[in-house]
UniProtKB/Swiss-Prot annotation:
Residues 62-139 are annotated as: Domain II. The keyword DNA damage applies. Residues 140-144 are annotated as: Flexible linker. One of its GO terms (cellular component) is Holliday junction resolvase complex. InterPro entries: DNA_helicase_Holl-junc_RuvA_I, RuvA, RuvA_2-like, RuvA_C. It comes from Mycoplasmopsis agalactiae (strain NCTC 10123 / CIP 59.7 / PG2) (Mycoplasma agalactiae). Homotetramer. Forms an RuvA(8)-RuvB(12)-Holliday junction (HJ) complex. HJ DNA is sandwiched between 2 RuvA tetramers; dsDNA enters through RuvA and exits via RuvB. An RuvB hexamer assembles on each DNA strand where it exits the tetramer. Each RuvB hexamer is contacted by two RuvA subunits (via domain III) on 2 adjacent RuvB subunits; this complex drives branch migration. In the full resolvosome a probable DNA-RuvA(4)-RuvB(12)-RuvC(2) complex forms which resolves the HJ. It is found in: Cytoplasm. It comes from the Bacteria. SUPFAM superfamilies: RuvA domain 2-like. One of its GO terms (molecular function) is ATP binding. Residues 144-198 are annotated as: Domain III. This is Holliday junction branch migration complex subunit RuvA. Pfam families: HHH_5 (PF14520), RuvA_C (PF07499), RuvA_N (PF01330).
Length: 198
């Protein structure tokens, strides 16, 4: 089993990337792809899924992220695609929520139902609470709460979830809710996003 490769990202389309290492191109699936840029040299940790339903190689920015992916797919009812979707929410955010036992916040992840969220917390909280400091967990959770407040406010104004997520991915996260709302609305307006009642 190949644990990692060092190379360069030569193409990126959504979560699908082409990663060149030692003259060989690898087709990989990378959660939260906004973290990497084309032509960026980096080390990616790999995990290959090969069965009758799927043949794919997932890539991760660090070993702990890969470890969480493996932990997630070991749980009953959570497959590779579901685990990928969870990590796409943001590795640090997910770890902080698991460490705090915050199943309610985990439910905000698209396609993650309450039963799965409670299962993740029940099975993984003890392990992952030891792998993140309380200070870091509190800081990440504060940012997550701010983003949730901004999202809910923008939904009430009439923007779609997809519009909001797209705008928030392009602005800096701060503890100033009003400023983030103003920046998000400005961005969506200038880029001619189509607004509609949620």
């Amino acid at each position: 089993m190949i644990l990692y490769r060092i190379g360069e990202i030569i193409h990126k389309h959504n979560s699908n990337i082409i990663f060149e290492s030692q003259g060989i191109g690898y087709s990989l699936i990378l959660p939260d792809p906004e973290r990497v840029e084309i032509k960026q040299k980096c080390k990616l940790y790999l995990f290959e899924i090969k069965n009758e339903y799927q043949y794919a190689t997932y890539a991760f920015k660090d070993f702990k992220e890969r470890l969480l992916f493996v932990d997630l797919i070991s749980l009953n009812g959570i497959g590779p695609r579901a685990a990928f979707n969870i990590l796409n929410f943001g590795f640090e955010k997910v770890v902080a929520l698991i460490a705090e036992g915050n199943a309610e916040a985990l439910i905000e992840i698209p396609y993650l139902n309450p039963r799965m969220a409670r299962l993740i917390v029940a099975e993984l909280q003890a392990k992952w609470s030891k792998m993140i400091s309380p200070k870091d967990a509190a800081k990440i959770n504060e940012t997550t709460n701010t983003l949730s407040e901004v999202k809910e406010t923008l939904k009430m104004v009439g923007f779609k979830t997809k519009q909001i997520d797209g705008a928030l991915s392009k602005i800096s996260s701060t503890d100033d809710v009003e400023k983030m709302i103003e920046e998000a609305i400005k961005l969506m307006s200038t880029q001619n996003y189509e607004s509609a009642t949620a």
